[in-house]
Design a protein with these regions (language model features):
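NAD(P)-dinucleotide binding in Rossmann-like oxidoreductases
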Residues: 27, 220, 225-228, 242-309, ...
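Beta-loop-alpha module in the N-terminal Rossmann-like domain of NAD(P)-dependent dehydrogenases
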Residues: 40, 72-132
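A contiguous active-site-proximal alpha/beta segment in oxidoreductase catalytic domains
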Residues: 97, 120-181
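Hydrophobic residues in well-ordered beta-strands that form the structural core
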Residues: 75, 92, 115, 140-142, ...
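C-terminal helix-rich "cap/oligomerization" subdomain common to oxidoreductases
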Residues: 1-25, 89-92, 313-356
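N-terminal Rossmann-like dinucleotide-binding module
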Residues: 2-69
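Rossmann-like dinucleotide-binding domain that binds NAD(P)(H)
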Residues: 182-246, 252-257, 329
Length: 356
C-alpha cells in the first residue's frame, strides 16, 4: 500500500484556524444572589451552552448555597469581578436602584452585560447609562424574558412573517396569582413600572411597532393596603401604535386560579393567540362539564424555559459577536410607556409617549 505524505505544518495550521474560529466559552460573574440571581446562576451552571460561571457577589450572600454550587469566587463586593481578566460578562441581578450605577461600572470595565429590568425608573438615568455602553462598545441585553417564552415567541413569528397580515389589535392579559406586600409596593415604582412594564415590552415585541399613545384606567379592587401605599392593583390600558395597530392590556394583582398569562394578535389575515401553561394537558369530561388544570401558579415555573432561552441568546450573541436580541433601547422604551401610563391615570386622559 502506498503511504500518503502528510504535511504536518499544514495540518497544525488548519487545527489552529479551527480553534481560532471556534466561539469561546463566555465566563460570567453575577451581581446579586437573591431569587433571580440564584435562578440565573443555576441556569448558567447547567443549562446554557457555552457559558461558565466563575463568580457571584452579594452583600448578604448565602455562602452555604454558593458552596453547594461550587462557584469558584464569591464575595460581598461586585468590584472584585471587574478587574478579573477571565470574566467576560457580568449579569446584574441586584436591587433595581443599583442597576444603572453597576451597569456603568461594568461597561467602563469592558465587560459585556446582561441587566435585569429595569435599568432605572428615570429616563435620564437610563440614557446616561446607555451612553456609557455605546462608548465602551460592549454588548448589553436587558432581561425581558417573556419575549423568549416559546408560545409568545411563536405568536410574534406569525406577525413578523406576515402570516396574520397587518396587525390590528394586540390583547395582553397579565394577572398575578397573589398581590405583593404593601411594603414592597411602596418601593416598586408602582404597578406600571413593576408589573405592566413586561406587558409594555410584550406589546412592542408582538406588534413590531412603537407605542405612541397610552390611556390608562386603574383601581384598587384587590387589597386596600396597596391603595394606602399609593398604588393600584387593577388596570386596563389602551394603546396606539405608530403602525396603526391598537392594543389592550388587562392587569390584576390577584387571579384566584393562578398566574394568568395570555396574548392574542388579530390581523387582517387572521389571529394568533397563546393560552396559559398548565401542569398537565389532561382534560376531564363528565356530567359536570369539562375540567382542566389551573394555570401554573408562579412566574419562575411559568417562564422556566424563557429564562434559559434569554440567557442562551445573550451567550450566543457574545460568542458570535452579534447584536443582542433585547437592546438598551428595548430597556428604555417600556419605561417611557409606563411613565406615560402613570401620567394618563393621574390626569384621566390619553398621554403621548413622546411627551415623557
Amino acid at each position: 500500500m502506498k503511504r500518503q505524505n502528510v504535511d504536518l505544518h499544514k495540518l497544525i495550521a488548519q487545527q489552529k484556524d479551527k480553534m481560532k474560529n471556534k466561539p469561546k466559552t463566555v465566563t460570567f460573574g453575577i451581581i446579586g444572589a437573591g431569587r433571580i440571581g440564584k435562578l440565573h446562576a443555576d441556569n448558567l451552571l447547567s443549562r446554557v451552552e457555552g457559558a461558565r460561571l466563575k463568580a457571584i457577589t452579594d452583600p448578604f450572600l448565602d455562602e452555604e448555597w454558593a458552596a453547594s454550587r461550587n462557584i469558584p469566587v464569591t464575595g460581598k463586593d461586585h468590584r472584585i469581578m471587574l478587574d478579573d481578566p477571565e470574566i467576560d460578562a457580568i449579569l446584574i441581578g441586584s436591587p433595581s436602584a443599583e442597576h444603572a450605577p453597576q451597569l456603568i461600572e461594568c461597561a467602563q470595565a469592558g465587560k459585556h452585560i446582561f441587566c435585569e429590568k429595569p435599568i432605572a425608573l428615570d429616563p435620564i438615568i437610563i440614557r446616561n447609562a446607555l451612553a456609557e455602553v455605546d462608548k465602551s462598545g460592549i454588548k448589553l441585553q436587558v432581561g425581558f424574558n417573556r419575549r423568549f417564552d416559546p408560545n409568545f415567541s411563536a405568536v410574534q413569528q406569525q406577525v413578523a412573517s406576515g402570516a396574520l397580515g397587518d396587525p390590528h389589535i394586540i390583547r395582553i392579559t397579565s394577572r398575578d396569582p397573589a398581590p405583593p406586600p404593601a411594603e414592597y409596593v411602596a418601593g416598586s415604582g408602582g404597578m406600571f413600572l413593576d408589573m405592566t412594564i413586561h406587558d409594555f415590552d410584550m406589546a412592542r415585541f408582538l406588534s413590531g411597532g412603537e407605542v405612541t399613545e397610552v390611556h390608562a384606567y386603574g383601581a384598587v379592587l384587590v387589597d386596600p393596603e396597596i391603595g394606602k401605599a399609593g398604588d393600584i392593583d387593577t388596570a386596563v390600558i389602551s394603546l396606539k401604535f405608530a403602525n396603526g395597530a391598537l392594543g389592550i392590556i388587562e392587569n390584576s394583582r390577584k387571579a384566584v386560579y393562578g398566574y394568568d398569562q395570555r396574548v392574542e394578535v388579530f390581523g387582517s389575515k387572521g389571529t394568533a393567540l397563546a393560552d396559559n401553561n398548565t401542569p398537565t394537558s389532561m382534560v376531564i369530561l363528565n356530567e359536570s362539564g369539562t375540567i382542566r388544570d389551573k394555570p401554573l401558579y408562579f412566574f419562575l415555573e411559568r417562564y422556566e424555559k424563557a429564562f434559559v432561552a434569554e440567557m442562551q441568546a445573550f451567550v450566543d450573541a457574545v460568542r458570535n459577536d452579534e447584536p443582542t436580541p433585547v437592546s438598551g433601547n428595548d430597556g428604555l422604551a417600556p419605561v417611557l410607556i409606563a411613565l406615560a401610563a402613570q401620567q394618563s391615570l393621574k390626569r384621566g386622559k390619553p398621554e403621548k409617549v413622546e411627551s415623557i
